[in-house]
């Protein structure tokens, strides 16, 4: 199979499997949200957010670093992957122990504190799985990771439905999460060892070298993901979220919409992840080729981004009702606001990876630090008065600031300002939007399917998308 076909195959299979995984995840969230209600789902979400902060600290950019290092000529893949994998697990174990200790100092219900203890195992499984993605991307076998995720999500959904039917309560739902995450890790580890014999490795001198290389990336990731997650922590604390009668319920309301955001931004992360080795390859020895790949990737992301944003703006209420039930209809305005953040995140994925490829992580870290400080300050200003609406608005403003700063850095580095070809996608999106608005009372699945057909048909007719351009991106 040629490189063109391999990349195209991986994109299609991974995207398809990822869509199935997202669907399973959203169905699972629907069952859980209906079973637990606003406050119970808020507790469930808070546990995941709290632990994700410690997972973020353990990330250290090792996933991106592994992809870059094993893509280099003459790389010792076994030593690199085994040591980075082991380093990630060791650091995470230390931080998860700290998380278990720290949670008891927060003013949360006891079920949240016990839940954190249970879910630490799931976070360990998912974190270990994530770092293995570098292997699948190097060998263009991301379909294996996608299959593992689908199976794991199916396990979790099946157990959740069973436990809800048996009315086993809150902690049983958390157990289903742990089992699903364990299944994903076991499968990913099995698949990864077919290409690289990953083992536990303790080359401390190499660990020191990796930590030195990873520090700028790690700092950037920590800053980025903290401002992604800290809003839920602020919402959960009554002395900050002073306008709320039930801060934990507000976390549930906010996270129903946020789960949609996390689901739909898979495409840019997956697509840009496959393009990253090419950007890294051409970043220094063929800058013109780098610019071409960068521009074509940006064009594809804009084409996908526009209908997503418009669709979420118009279908926010039926989407949140479908996922969480009418009890969560108050989440619709949150999703409408976050739809703009989704558009910015699409662009930010490409810009962030390009900064790493251009070896500008240290400057990038200052950008993410600025974003984190801005996010924390604005959250502390707006959450006390506007609760989850303030949190969502702050997320959009932060993404806008970070995106603009990344564009400036990239332009100064490669002496090239990218073209934002949005006019034709916007025209096609407007046609799609008019259809959805006119038939808004129709079945949501019909609206999504027909809307997508209308969008791409109009885009093709006005020559906003060409098959040759997509193939050209892959070839380059």
Model-identified regions with their sequence ranges:
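Interhelical loop/hinge segments that connect adjacent transmembrane helices in multipass membrane
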Residues: 1-3, 7, 143, 188-228, ...
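Signature of the first transmembrane helix
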Residues: 3-63, 96, 100, 153-157, ...
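Transmembrane helical elements of multi-pass membrane transporters/channels
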Residues: 10-25, 152, 176-180, 184-188, ...
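Hydrophobic transmembrane helix module of multi-pass membrane transport proteins
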Residues: 20, 88-229
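Helix-loop junctions and terminal segments of transmembrane helices
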Residues: 29, 58-75, 138, 261-298, ...
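Membrane-interface junctions at transmembrane-helix termini in multi-pass inner-membrane proteins
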Residues: 69, 125-148, 171, 339-370
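Interfacial segments at transmembrane-helix termini and the short loops linking adjacent helices
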Residues: 103-119, 248, 295, 312-343
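Membrane-proximal transmembrane or re-entrant/amphipathic helices at the cytosolic face
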Residues: 437-476
């Amino acid at each position: 199979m040629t490189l063109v076909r391999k990349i195209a195959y991986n994109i299609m299979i991974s995207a398809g499997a990822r869509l199935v995984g997202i669907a399973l995840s959203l169905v699972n969230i629907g069952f859980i949200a209906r079973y637990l209600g606003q406050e119970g789902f808020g507790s469930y979400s808070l546990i995941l957010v709290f632990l994700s902060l410690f997972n973020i600290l353990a990330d250290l950019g090792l996933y991106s670093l592994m992809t870059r290092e094993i893509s280099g000529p003459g790389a010792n893949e076994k030593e690199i992957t085994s040591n980075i994998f082991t380093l990630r697990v060791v650091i995470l174990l230390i931080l998860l122990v700290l998380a278990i200790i720290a949670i008891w100092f927060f003013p949360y219900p006891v079920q949240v504190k016990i839940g954190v203890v249970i879910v630490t195992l799931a976070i360990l499984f998912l974190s270990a799985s994530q770092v293995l993605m570098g292997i699948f991307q190097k060998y263009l076998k991301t379909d294996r990771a996608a299959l593992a995720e689908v199976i794991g999500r199916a396990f979790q959904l099946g157990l959740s439905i069973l436990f809800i039917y048996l009315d086993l309560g809150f902690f049983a739902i958390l157990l289903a999460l742990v089992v699903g995450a364990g299944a994903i890790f076991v499968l990913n580890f099995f698949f990864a060892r077919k290409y690289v014999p990953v083992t536990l490795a303790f080359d401390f001198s190499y660990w020191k070298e990796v930590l030195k290389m990873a520090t700028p990336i790690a700092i950037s990731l920590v800053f980025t993901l903290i401002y992604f997650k800290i809003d839920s922590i602020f919402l959960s604390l009554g002395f900050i979220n002073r306008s709320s009668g039930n801060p934990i319920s507000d976390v549930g309301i906010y996270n129903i919409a946020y789960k949609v955001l996390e689901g739909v931004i898979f495409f840019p992360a997956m697509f840009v992840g496959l393009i990253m080795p090419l950007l890294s390859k051409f970043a220094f020895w063929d800058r013109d080729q780098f610019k071409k790949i960068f521009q074509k990737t940006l064009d594809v992301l804009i084409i996908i981004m526009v209908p997503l944003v418009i669709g979420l703006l118009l279908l926010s209420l039926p989407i949140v009702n479908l996922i969480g039930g009418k009890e969560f209809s108050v989440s619709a305005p949150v999703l409408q606001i976050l739809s703009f953040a989704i558009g910015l995140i699409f662009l930010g994925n490409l810009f962030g990876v390009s900064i790493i490829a251009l070896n500008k992580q240290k400057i990038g870290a200052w950008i993410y630090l600025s974003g984190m400080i801005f996010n924390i300050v604005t959250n502390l200003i707006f959450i006390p008065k506007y609760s989850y609406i303030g949190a969502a608005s702050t997320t959009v403003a932060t993404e806008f600031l970070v995106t603009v700063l990344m564009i400036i850095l990239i332009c100064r580095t490669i002496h090239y300002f990218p073209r934002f070809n949005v006019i034709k996608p916007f025209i096609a999106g407007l046609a799609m939007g008019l259809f959805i608005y006119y038939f808004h009372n129709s079945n949501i699945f019909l609206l999504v399917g027909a809307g997508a057909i209308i969008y791409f048909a109009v885009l093709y007719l006005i020559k906003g998308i060409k098959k040759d351009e997509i193939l050209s991106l892959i070839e380059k």
